[in-house]
Structure formats: structure tokens, C-alpha cells
Amino acid sequence: MDAKYKVVDVDTFARQLITDKCSELIETENLLPANILHVVKQARDKYFEDPSVKNYEYVKNLFLRTKYMDDSIDYKNFNRRVLLIVFKFALNRGSGYFPSYRELIEVAVKRLNKINPDLKSSPRAMLQHYNECLENLDNPVTDEHHLLTFGKEVATKMFIEAFEFSYASNNEINLTTNKRGSDLFDPIPMPAPAPAPSASLLDNVMNERKRKLQASVTTTPPKRCKLADRPAQTTQDTPRAPQPAPVRAQRPLFTL
């Protein structure tokens, strides 16, 4: 084999390829600040020069922590947006159920519309997030399933952005189209009772019932009465006349 060709391990080549794609994605999508991105690039170049196990574990942990912090921010933003929508829905519905407190509820809705649910808009929330990340550094971080990540993205696109369609124009989310006139809840609609039968139909049914009863009475046979036992006779039976003895037929002496 020519000396200018260098044998590269397949696993090492795959790791270097994935490392290059991860660093390129972080750089193009601006997932990290410039100073932190510079550290990631240095770790990547060092791993390319010396693909040792130590350099590989170092750059792998950098990518893992970057993904963990980014995913945790997106997940918290999703939960904050859902909670904000729940508050808006409850206030909009409450203004219809309790019209006497409509003015107070409208003021609360206006203040709620000015709140930005993104985590990065609140310095206190970001500081709490960084503290949680520091506390979780010593604990193992397990990546979630890719279908779970895709489900969060779909829910964000369909659920949140659908409700915020009206929020982009007038900074409000209208979930109700009509107003109620009382503080009472709407009664549950009950099914209408069946209409009462007319007099002629009721008479026909009664006559048919009587006819069937009469027919069943006439076709049923009468029950037989049990006769009482005859009392024993106290008088003696009259003596019977003697019967003559039966005459036996005589056989002839000679037969032809």
C-alpha cells in the first residue's frame, strides 16, 4: 500500500462526519453565542487532528449540553404558551358567565395580552433556567424519543399558532363570539317528551284490548268439579238368585 494513504477507522470517520454536521448546524442556525461557538469549533478541530477517545468525549459532551439547553428552553416555552392560552380562555369565558364582573375581567385580559410567553423575554425566568441547568449537570441527561419531539412541534404549529392567528393583528385572542345575559350557566337541553296519543287512538286500543279479553274467556274450557265420595250404604245387599252350573259339551264317540 502506498505510504501517502492513511488508514482511517470506519467508526472514527462516522464520528468525525457527525461532529462536522453538528457544528455546522449550530453555526448556521445561531444556536449558540459567538464566544461559546468558538469553544465548540476549537474542540471540533482538535478532535479532527487527534481523534482520541478523550477529544471525542469532550466534543460529544459539548454537543449534548448544547442540545439539552436548547430543548429545555423550547419545552418550557411550549408549556408557558399553553398556560397563557388557558388563562385567556378562562377569562373570556368568565366574562360571559359573570357579566357583573365584565369590566374587571376585561382589564385582566388586556394586561394578560401584553405578557410575552417566551422564556427569553423574562430575565428572572432565564436565571432560574440557568440555575436548573447547573444543578442538572451532574445528573445523566436522557434524550427524548424523536416522535415526542415531533409531536411537540406539531402541537406548537397547530394548537398555539391557530389561537394566535387573531393575536397577530389586534393583540387579542377571541375565543367567544356571543355574550350571555345572565350569570347563570346554560341549562342542559333535555329531549322533548313524546306527544300524547289522541282520544280516537286511545279508544281503539282499549276496544282492541277488551275484544282480546272476551275472546280469551270464551275459548278457555270450564274447569271440571270433583264429585264428592258417595257415603257407604248401611243397608245389606239383597241376595242374588243362584246361577245354574254351566253345561259342558260332550265329545262324540266316533268321528269320521
Swiss-Prot record:
Pfam families: DUF816. Residues 211-256 are annotated as: Disordered. Residues 246-256 have a biased composition (Low complexity). InterPro entries: DUF816. This is Uncharacterized 29.4 kDa protein. It comes from Orgyia pseudotsugata multicapsid polyhedrosis virus.
